[in-house]
Swiss-Prot record:
Reaction(s) catalysed (UniProt annotation): sulfate + ATP + H(+) = adenosine 5'-phosphosulfate + diphosphate
Source organism of the structure: Methylorubrum extorquens (strain PA1) (Methylobacterium extorquens)
Protein name: Sulfate adenylyltransferase subunit 1
Chain positions covered by the region annotation G5: 202-204
CDD domains: CysN_ATPS, CysN_NodQ_II, CysN_NoDQ_III
Function text: With CysD forms the ATP sulfurylase (ATPS) that catalyzes the adenylation of sulfate producing adenosine 5'-phosphosulfate (APS) and diphosphate, the first enzymatic step in sulfur assimilation pathway. APS synthesis involves the formation of a high-energy phosphoric-sulfuric acid anhydride bond driven by GTP hydrolysis by CysN coupled to ATP hydrolysis by CysD.
Organism lineage: Bacteria, Pseudomonadati, Pseudomonadota, Alphaproteobacteria, Hyphomicrobiales
Pathways per UniProt: Sulfur metabolism; hydrogen sulfide biosynthesis; sulfite from sulfate: step 1/3
A Gene Ontology molecular function term of the record: ATP binding
NCBIfam families per the UniProt record, alphabetical: CysN (TIGR02034), PRK05124.1 (NF003478)
Keywords: ATP-binding, GTP-binding, Nucleotide-binding, Nucleotidyltransferase, Transferase
GO biological process, one term: sulfate assimilation
Statement: the UniProt record of this protein carries the keyword Transferase: yes
Annotated signal sequence range: none
Amino acid sequence: MTIHQSPEAFGYDAFLRQHQNKEVLRFITCGSVDDGKSTLIGRLLHDTKQIFDDQVTALQRDSRKHGTQGGEVDLALLVDGLQAEREQGITIDVAYRFFSTDRRSFIVADTPGHEQYTRNMATGASTADLAVILVDARHGLTRQSRRHALLVSLLGIRRVALAINKMDLVGWSQDKFEAIVSGFQAFAAPLNFTEVRAIPLSAKNGDNVVLPGTAATWYTDVPLLRYLEEVPVKSEERAAAFRMPVQWVNRPNSDFRGFSGLIASGSVAPGDAVTVAPSGKTSTIARIFTADGDLERASEGQSVTLVLADEVDASRGAVIATSDAPLTLTDSLDVRLFWAAESDLVPGANLWAKVGTQTVNAVVKAVHRRIDPETGQAGPADKLAVNDIGDVTLTLDRQIAVDPYAENRDTGSLILIDRETTDTAALGLVQRVVASSKVAPAPTASVTASAEPARSGGLLAGLKRLFGG
């Protein structure tokens, strides 16, 4: 592990190029109340030199007023930003923090441990690549620990760092550590995790967080940060079929027409055959345009403008996908919901469903079952209350293009929006695509379009800000 150097060390241009090209890992911290999630993130920020002098001064002042570490600096206050959190010593909202090393950039979400904030945790986990599940070494696995392991599994996170915290308070006992690891592995066996990496640490003292600790001579593996630097990122998304929801149609003049968006999965190159959903029109990629020039290939996570060889009618909400594995068109979905609204969800409820860049009307046709968030077992249900997880069938007012969530997290997820308040009511994961009651359009191709680039300086400046490759 190396902490990133200052820009003065080797020049600003080189510094910017180095950090622009680094991979980004999004991860969440979760666990029971007072397991030390916020302290762990504070330690990562502190020991990777991400805190400015004025923040240190403010932290020392706040530690005297709100701290829980006696006379010592309370690193948790770097993350617990709400007044209610500081006064209660708990995390309520999802707090996002950013930091980087020479090897990788990180976006970390500190998610709440209380049951009543399950919806907040689901929000933080929905975009994460990895979960850091904290366990207090004194208490071992708790009901909340198991609940969070199940939730991150349901949300498609396949890699877990089991951070057994406060090991200094149990004398760095190897027996205690191994007992917790064994219990977690037994519970997580049916949860389909591809990797569980157990790390003993002390977030308060910094042992095995950024730098190796010296107290546990029996632990010879890497500290937490080194694991976060080395774990594979987005490997499943890169291997998945190409998908790009259209954010806007880029047509600055009559000679140029392209479709701009963020590639959700897979990769694409000029000459590749693609299908535009929901129209079913087919074409090939003529150009991959960015403000910095054309690309020979673009992949997951890049914002680009795709120019097609044919004049295809598409707008915001459409999805461009590889013709080898097109999306399914449907107006009915079986969805697993993480219900966040205070009012109960019952059959007949009318909401908006936002899928990618498209928003449609959705009616709850049926509520089938509720999932116990501690055991994963399903039971019959006719409604969902706040923080419930359940399976429902949605009927939409028109066809949309989707994948099952197990195949693609981006094109297989949605949010439900309350039509009266416009509040987010639920996070939804597509479990099964129900056969559509409408006839899907036949794939067709159209008139060849011009692939000549736009030459406007103003356009290029705008593209560099918004859709630079």
